[in-house]
Amino acid sequence: MILTIDIGNTNIVMGCFHKDQLLLLERFSTEQDSTSLEYATIIREMLDLHEITPAQIRGGIISSVVPSVTNTVREAAEKFTGARMLVVGPGIKTGIKLAVDDPAQQGSDLIVGAVAGVHSYPVPQIIIDMGTATTVSVINRDKAYIGKMILPGVAVSLNALSGKAAQLPYISLEKPKKLIGSNTVDSMKSGILYGNAGAMDGLIDRINEELGEECTVVATGGLAGVITPLCRHEIILDEDLLLKGLLILYYKNCGNEKE
């Protein structure tokens, strides 16, 4: 089995694959002050929950946008499983051409998503990742990563609104019954949810116009399932996209034997 770990700014998503089958999918908070022992305890609990033993893990791969946590989680996973953990970074084979000004500045999560996107869906392609930040990546018909847009994530926007406006409460993100809100809470929900959906539709239109052709659109990330149903464009929701990309990169760099 292969352990896949995606370290984000807010959450860490962990998966475990047997061949191409995802057997485990768990999410826990990213804590920059946690020790390798504390993370090892979490990993152990997650594997125990799914009745997976350390001996069954023959390797793993980690993608991270939080450098201060990367080595801590890697040490935790290696210490508990005894298997080597590959970290996505410079020198790793991706099979993706990075047609951008500085390839070294591209986040590993974006590269992992692009690898999975190209492997699974037609190009040209737009990949929307809705996490702490929302990123909109573009892959052209030659399967080259040509750039991206970055905007505040849904939760970040909501927290900023509630935190800076004294009379606006903190709210949960359920779809309101109608677009035009008749009370403060529904008005905020409508603005955040439909506003983000409208932003995605607008960016998709502009990207298609700039490329001169229609793109396949794929969405992933913690809040993609909330926003994409409100978009007018057809968007493929793939919540496991990054874990699939990590598995592809593991096989590409560590051999193709699938166990």
Which residue ranges define each predicted feature?
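Active-site rim beta-loop-alpha module in soluble metabolic enzymes
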Residues: 139, 144, 151-210
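Generic secondary-structure signature for well-ordered alpha-helical cores
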Residues: 48, 52, 78, 82-83, ...
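Conserved phosphate-binding catalytic cores of ATP/NTP-utilizing and phosphoryl-transfer enzymes
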Residues: 95-125, 245-255
